[in-house]
From Swiss-Prot:
It comes from Phytophthora sojae (strain P6497). Disruption phenotype: Results in loss of the avirulence phenotype on soybean cultivar containing the resistance protein Rps1k. Residues 222-240 are annotated as: W2 motif. This is RxLR effector protein Avh331. Belongs to the RxLR effector family.
Length: 279
């Protein structure tokens, strides 16, 4: 069974056996609302690829029969969103015929799933999750886990999920939501990636659309950490990147660009500090 790092309850619908599996996670004890992930597995019909997570919806406990009434909260985006949503609509409306299983009898309204699929088809795969996570008050730390960026061995450079997270975090910060700021974003990335690799990652994303301003702020936070540690630009190669002789690096090595950018940052802030001391 696929593992999800967050949001309370996972419900998987089989395309053949028609069984609905629910699994509570540890967050159930800390969050007041119930949420559901609708996800697919590799054993399902070939029209849905493994890992295509389609919907995150809230579930309010029914007042009478103890049944869950589903309402739209969010939807995950993957590269297979277009295929996935079409298949979701098809399965949601035909599940009784194909598997002889009544979702209604399980306390779930199949029309909700159909509406979820129709709603997803109006959004692009690149922004679906971010827009709906914002609607669902998902914070960047949770989004980091939902995207699998907290998993051991994950690659960050050239990872589209990393860019998606940065875009989401910028949108989250622009909405001035409390509890997570630029300092929190840098601390999260620094803890997971480390200073040297983080600086290279941010360099690779400095021109990223809808995220470049946040990338620059995170870069300044990293440079500020080195500056506060009194690391001189000429020391950065050996102290941080463990390079004994920078002259042996290719001219297009991104480490040289990081060192040069840090030198500019260092000079600027040294001039600022000197001006304060003169005053």
């Amino acid at each position: 069974m696929m593992q999800w790092s967050a949001i309370l309850i996972r419900t998987c619908f089989s395309g053949s056996g028609g069984e609905a599996l629910t699994c509570a996670t540890s967050e159930q004890q800390t969050r007041p609302e119930l949420c559901f992930f609708f996800s697919v597995r590799s054993s399902w019909p070939s029209t849905i690829s493994d890992g295509a997570c389609l919907a995150l919806v809230s579930a309010e406990q029914g007042a009478t029969a103890g049944r869950n009434t589903l309402s739209l909260r969010s939807m995950m985006a993957t590269e297979d969103m277009a295929t996935s949503t079409r298949s979701l609509r098809s399965q949601a409306t035909n599940v009784d015929d194909d598997a002889n299983v009544s979702i209604e009898n399980r306390g779930m309204n199949p029309s909700v799933l159909t509406k979820l699929g129709e709603f997803a088809s109006t959004l692009t795969a690149g922004n679906t999750a971010n827009k709906l996570w914002l609607m669902a008050d998902v914070d960047p730390k949770s989004a980091f886990k939902l995207l699998g960026l907290d998993m051991p061995g994950v690659r960050f450079i050239d990872n589209p999920k990393m860019l998606q997270w940065l875009k989401f975090t910028k949108a989250y910060l622009d909405m001035k939501k409390s509890g997570f700021g630029e300092t929190s974003a840098h601390a999260l990335l620094y803890e997971k990636i480390g200073g040297p690799d983080l600086s290279l990652l941010l360099l690779s994303l400095k021109d990223a659309p809808d995220a470049n301003s946040l990338v620059q702020k995170l870069t300044n936070s990293q440079f500020g950490m080195w500056h506060d540690a009194r690391i001189e630009p000429e020391q950065l190669a050996q102290t941080v990147f463990k390079i004994q002789d920078v002259r042996k690096l290719p001219k297009n090595d991104p480490k040289l660009q990081v060192i040069d950018d840090y030198a500019k940052y260092h000079r600027k802030h040294r001039k600022f500090l000197n001006s304060i001391m003169i005053i």
